[in-house]
């Protein structure tokens, strides 16, 4: 029984969820993000979900948490594209989310 509880506790830690927190200072961030104007300019198309259980792996479904310690990734929104690690575009529908440039996928693991 003890081992089952340990395994059940560790399984959520190994999933690649996309709970993000928008940080105030760039030096505290894991990833610097720039929001582009057009979909064809982005590396990742992001859909903001309403609940944390709606995130599904590294597929561009982001849930913005209220506290830094709840997040999987801390992101900082930059003012210029050349300052960013990742360029994103917010989409209107869940099925539109996903990676356009898979070479940047490692940034969100």
Name each model feature, range by range:
Residues 1-15:
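Sec-dependent N-terminal signal peptides
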Residues 18-109:
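Repetitive, compositionally biased segments used for assembly/scaffolding
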């Amino acid at each position: 029984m003890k081992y089952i509880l340990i395994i059940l506790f560790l399984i959520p830690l190994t999933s690649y969820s996309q709970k993000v927190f928008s940080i105030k200072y760039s030096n505290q961030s894991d990833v610097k993000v720039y929001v582009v104007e057009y979909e064809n300019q982005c590396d990742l198309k992001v859909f903001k979900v309403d609940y944390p259980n709606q995130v599904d792996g590294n597929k561009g479904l982001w849930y913005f948490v209220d506290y830094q310690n709840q997040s999987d990734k801390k992101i900082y929104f930059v003012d210029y594209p050349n300052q960013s690690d990742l360029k994103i575009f917010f989409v209107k529908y869940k099925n539109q989310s996903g990676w356009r440039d898979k070479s940047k996928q490692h940034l969100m693991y």
